[in-house]
Amino acid sequence: MDITGNKATAYGFIAAAEKAGLKLYLGSYPITPATDVLHELSKHKSLGVTTVQCEDEIAGCASSVGASFAGALAVTSTSGPGICLKSEAMNLAVIMELPLVVLDVQRGGPATGLPTKSEQTDLLQALFGRNGESPMPVIAATSPTDCFESAYAASKMALELYKPFIMRKLEQMGVAQNIKRAKNLVEQEAPEVWGILDEVVK
């Protein structure tokens, strides 16, 4: 069976959501060559996947930030020009310490570029394209197999990087004596964890 990078990426997100025990949410605006991910994920509602085709790139990313806030594995997808538009909502996820996976299926060339030709032309934008020097890890896939693994790894990183804040708070509050105990409380979704989240959102 032949598999494209976009299809492998979609399956990687599904696998990560299943492993994490979370619903998968994709907020996206159709843009070549990333639209296939939206199409593929929309076929898998029975696996707890929600896809929303938004009115524009900004809404796609902002809706994913909201889904992350609600507890889903949140993903937004786009290509070169869309990353520019999503940057403010990406910054919102960073400052709120919410897990968010941003998929950039890159086009060749500047501006609208060559929509049907993929190449690695957005790397600098992916690394440094947000104001306020807000950090985001970047994973660059090189093959369909790598696309599956990269989507899975990006999802895992997004979810794991959010946990340390809660674990520190559990230690500071005296609820857990060490990081290992704090991690267990997070994984068990103990009431103390929800109390910390309530403090964050007030």
Predicted regions and their residues:
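Electropositive phosphate-/nucleotide-binding environments in soluble metabolic enzymes
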Residues: 3, 7, 31, 35, ...
